[in-house]
Amino acid sequence: MTDVSAPTGGATSPVDITASPGSTALPPVATTSAAASASSSQAKPLTNGAKKAATAAAAAGAEEGGASASNQVKQEQRRQSNNNRPAASGTPEAKQATPAGNPDPGAGSTSKSSSIHTQTSQQERAGRPTSSASQHDVDEVARLFEEKPEAFEKWLTERAPPEALGRLQEFIESRKPLKRPSVTSDLFQQWMAASPTVQQKSPRSLSNSSASSIPESRRHLMDLDEGELFMELIRDVANELDIDVLCHKILVNVGLLTHADRGSLFLAKGAPNNKYLVAKLFDVTQKTALKDAVTRASTEEIIIPFGIGIAGMVAQTKQMINIKEAYKDARFNCEIDLKTGYKTNAILCMPICNYEGDIIGVAQIINKTNGCMEFDEHDVEIFRRYLTFCGIGIQNAQLFEMSVQEYRRNQILLNLARSIFEEQNNLECLVTKIMTEARELLKCERCSVFLVDLDCCEAGCGRVGGAMRRFGVRSKQVSAIVEHVGGRRGNTSHLEKIIEKPNQPATRAIKSADSFEEKKMRNRFTVLFELGGEYQAANVSRPSTSELSTSTLAQIAQFVATTGQTVNICDVHEWVREHNQIRAESEIDSTQAILCMPIVNAKKTVIGVAQLINKANGVPFTESDASIFEAFAIFCGLGIHNTQMYENACKLMAKQKVALECLSYHATASQDQTEKLTQDAIADADTYNLYSFTFTDFELVDDDTCRAVLRMFMQCNLVSQFQIPYDVLCRWVLSVRKNYRPVKYHNWRHALNVAQTMFAMLKTGKMERFMTDLEILGLLVACLCHDLDHRGTNNAFQTKTESPLAILYTTSTMEHHHFDQCVMILNSEGNNIFQALSPEDYRSVMKTVESAILSTDLAMYFKKRNAFLELVENGEFDWQGEEKKDLLCGMMMTACDVSAIAKPWEVQHKVAKLVADEFFDQGDLEKLQLNTQPVAMMDRERKDELPKMQVGFIDVICLPLYRVLCDTFPWITPLYEGTLENRRNWQDLAEKVEMGLTWIDHDTIDKPVEEFAACADEEIKDIEFTVTTLNCNQSQQSQHGSEDSHTPEHQRSGSRLSMKKTGALGKAVRSKLSKTLYNSMDGSKPKTSLKLLESHVSEDMDDKSPTSPSQPQAAGSMGRMSASSSTSSAGGQGQCQVAAPGQAQDKSKKRSKLCALL
């Protein structure tokens, strides 16, 4: 280290500009550039902040040179032992000012800086001190930094000598705050980044190289006074976190402070009420190496209970003991002196406490080395003061060691968690891995796991037999009854004290000896996993009855399985004597301590027992060991439980496969049916009326429905286009029909009608021009399969009842099931109509089928409707994009699914009755099973509201859909027109219900409307109604009128007419009718008859224009109510024709022109 003196203002002031031993002096001109050197060395421009920092650094350098010169010289003189003193003055050549009028300040600065560094280097090589810069030089450099920072940067990068840069860097480092290396971060990061081999070792092994360096620098430390030495030794241990290195430093440093010959350090261990001391390092001198001290302490472990010996007494009383003559003190143990030949004279033993005042260790020093025979008061005070700081360091080191152990424990548990899923099909490997990790972490000699076979236990206990059989263990099914024992009877027995954790209050009891023996005889273990030493492989065996009855370890395990409690046995011999067990001498002699814990499953049922046998250091298992071992037991239980679940899942999958095979066999059409359909002649499409939107299946028998499906495939040229074998197609159609349940509406015939509507939309509606052949195939398949295996209940019912389907599919429950059934049939042997498709085409058609079937969920319809309407409003006409095509197919599927609403009235009202009956059946189930009130459309008690609900269904779903479709594709207008016509019919019936009529009193919907009936020769006591059909001619009405005249009274309940309700009848007609009826009832003979009613109706109709848009429903209503009305048979519909023929022709012409234009 070099001191530099420079005259300033005529005075001589020495300045020390270095901060570390061995560094070289740096001229102040160079040091003023400290703030800019870091950035300039990397050739980056200086920012304004850098400029200001450089200026501040220059000023600080000058101030430091003047203000702290004397203190630095004193420190330098103390540290220098070679009498190297600084010169009193510097050379005048060291000073150099900037030439006046220099046109290039930057160049001047460069020249000046170069000159200064050159002179400094020459002076140092010549052994002469350098001179300090004047304040004027500092100001010039600061101004130069502000005006021309690029010039200084250029000089640093291009012309500065390496020596100057090195000194500049040293000066920057010296200006930084003093920072001692932190062992916390370095040690922990080193340990985490180390290889697995290093991680398995204690983290203290990484710090062996960083052992105390005090013996090497002893001469230097001896030159310090007592106060400085004390502080230096405190710094030496302040940041040390490796417990072994720390203890070694403490003993060596204490020897330096007190001139003690050797020392020992004991750390407190054990539970709060069972404390003992463990010799961390013993008999350490100032020349003892750390490795030797640690090795000796680990091989010759010394354990001293509190209150025993000198160290034990200090730990118990927390009082210092200073013995002048050890051999005269009864507490002194001279055995070690006799073994080593060393004679102990003076002993100073002092406790080490933490900030709470608890004992964490005891330090002991022996014999003085400076000729004194005893430790005086000064030694005691120094010892006490130093140990106060050492207590903080020891506690920090212990906390660090605990954090490292916790980190490793967490890593092990994380690996075990991964192993649970990696080894879920191999219980032996999983249990062996868990035992290996537990043995290494807890440092025990042996580890065992007993598994209980629960085949004969109560339901819910689980199984492990199948998992055991997978690794070759053939065990008998032995029941194990595990009972938790509660309550305490009498005083605590000696047995209970022994099996508790060491010196812990007994908290567990058994009911009686007989009860315990009885349970023990019933508990049997079927599998035993044993893991011995480090290089021993795991042993898996099936213990016999005799082995279980004679093995002490098995007896302890049975006790734990019976009570379900953890036991920590510190004296196995005492446990054996207490239980009068048959000794297995080899087993007992080698067993000292046992930690035994139950393994439970998710239902808290004991499925096994885990045991740890003998700690490696011979001490009992602690409460901390039990806590760690509990985590291993939990993971072991999770692994066994997961293995059981995996086994059960495999079994269930196997059962499902068998069930699917059986289902596939029974769900597939027979060979005889297939051959018969294959040989049948298929009529043309016109025979089945397939091209018409008014198609009905009422006239078709079951075989005809299959033939009609085949005809649709043929007409679309799908059989030849995709090379579908004809027998495969026939078998598939029959299998699809077979997989529909015989529910009232969502059955095979509904699927046929949906498929026919799709066929009519593609052919008659000319929508096939927007579809590829593969998409047409997918749409027809989807229509036929869209309600496969329908149960007659909707998605909401599946969710309410928490059915397996609802658990399997959370959204669109039934639709997903329909698609799965479709896939199941296609995968059945001889039913794959897609077998000739390429993989790409197969994926494409299956995607179309899935999307189309899921689109039949009305929730999906409402989700897609707005996007579809937006495309239509924007004038979309191509429909070839993937998303556009998906939207179009979804709307088409919904239109086909509800197409019954557009059928002719005689078909529609029958289908509505079927839908209503199916809904009412679901409502009955909701009342019976769920005890809830169903919605109106499923409530049988509100059946009269069905016409009104039909009108709402048409208005909300059907009409908006068909309107936008026919606006875009005018060839499907019949669907829209048919829906409008049926809406008028349903609205008419809804008005009848409001008048008090009942439309659905009968088992079938053939006679939905009630009419007036009166006999001329009988007195009218009330207005009676008879039921006639809607689609009937005059002869049919008269026939039905004669039949209904014999209808019993109880079948005509609710047939009173309420004149207070408004309906289709005009106000004038109701008034006239009311007056006529009541006037006729006042006479002896009534004059009311059907003709009288007809006359009033005719008068009312004559008063209104037949083309009025607001009256067709009323006219139609009265036409159906009049038995002899001439309009009742018009069109075979029983409705009054209110539109002129010319108007219909005009509409037809306009529609034809629009179609031709498109």
Curated annotation (Swiss-Prot):
Residues 1148-1158 have a biased composition (Basic residues). Residues 242-394, 426-640 form the GAF domain. It comes from the Eukaryota. The keyword Membrane applies. Residues 1156-1158 form a propeptide. This is cGMP-specific 3',5'-cyclic phosphodiesterase. Residues 1041-1052 have a biased composition (Basic and acidic residues). Interacts with PrBP. A divalent metal cation 1 binds at H750, H786, D787, D897. It is a lipid-anchor. Residues 670-993 form the PDEase domain. It comes from Drosophila ananassae. Has a role regulating cGMP transport in Malpighian tubule principal cells. The lineage of its organism: Eukaryota, Metazoa, Ecdysozoa, Arthropoda, Hexapoda. Pfam families: GAF, PDEase_I. GO terms for molecular function: 3',5'-cyclic-GMP phosphodiesterase activity; metal ion binding. A lipid is attached at C1155 (S-farnesyl cysteine). Its cofactor is a divalent metal cation. Keywords: Cell membrane, cGMP, Hydrolase, Lipoprotein, Membrane, Metal-binding, Methylation, Prenylation, Repeat. The active site is at H746. One of its GO terms (biological process) is signal transduction. CDD domains: HDc. Residues 108-135 have a biased composition (Polar residues). A divalent metal cation 2 binds at D787. Residues 30-71, 202-215, 1114-1130 have a biased composition (Low complexity). It catalyses: 3',5'-cyclic GMP + H2O = GMP + H(+). Gene3D superfamilies: 3'5'-cyclic nucleotide phosphodiesterase, catalytic domain, 3.30.450.40.
